[in-house]
A protein has these predicted regions:
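Solvent-exposed, non-transmembrane regions of membrane-associated and secreted proteins
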Residues: 1-201
């Protein structure tokens, strides 16, 4: 059985819904990430101690597997708060100069550490269920094959305002950070990164 990393032991004892911790150096993004596969929106408006909280706590989409048999992509949601907290600062990734200063994202699960490098960042939206015209980034969890993986990466790269020079190969581990954005109704801003280091790299 996998062992909980020492730094997570106390937090895990307090709340075993914790999946890990997300940090982007030089920003306010430094938060626990929750995972409740039976109730996707559980932490939408709850803090780590399960008390009501408007900003909620970042959480992993229930369709992802962040630990054993990890899905190619781990999709993490967080609120965009006017006060600047939670995932507000992700929107700055639209600007290449911000990207250049914040190329790496740290996402440690409770079992292993991981550093990710940003591939791209883009505006999108949540489309109607019957929409077939647009690519739905929020439905990509596991690629059936290389072509499906490459389609996701191509979508990310082609919708990013600058070329990060970073891409991903089929078999790489991805994280996708998603937050609300006001450019359109049901707008979203999305940052995608690939794992470059960790305990097993």
């Amino acid at each position: 059985e996998k062992k909980i990393l020492k730094k997570f032991e106390k937090l895990y004892e307090k709340n075993s819904d914790i999946a890990g911790w997300l940090t982007i150096d030089g920003t306010t993004i430094d938060y626990p990430v929750m995972y409740t596969p039976d109730d996707n929106d559980y932490y939408l408006h709850l803090d780590f101690d399960k008390n009501w909280s408007d900003p909620g706590t970042p959480f992993i989409d229930m369709n992802c597997r962040p630990f054993d048999d990890r899905t190619d992509n781990v999709l993490i949601y967080g609120h965009n708060m006017k006060s600047g907290i939670m995932f507000r600062e992700l929107l700055q990734y639209e600007d290449e100069s911000f990207y250049k200063k914040h190329k790496n994202i740290k996402f440690d699960t409770v079992y292993e550490t991981g550093t990710y490098e940003v591939i791209g960042a883009f505006r999108s939206e949540i489309y109607p269920d019957d929409d077939t015209e647009h690519y739905h980034y929020y439905e990509f969890f596991n690629a059936a094959d290389k072509a499906e993986f490459d389609e996701y990466i191509d979508f990310v790269k082609s919708n990013t305002a600058y070329d990060s020079g970073v891409t991903a190969e089929y078999g790489d581990e991805l994280i996708t950070l998603s937050t609300c954005a006001s450019h359109t109704e049901d707008g979203r801003f999305v940052v995608v990164a690939r794992r470059i280091t960790g305990d097993d790299k």
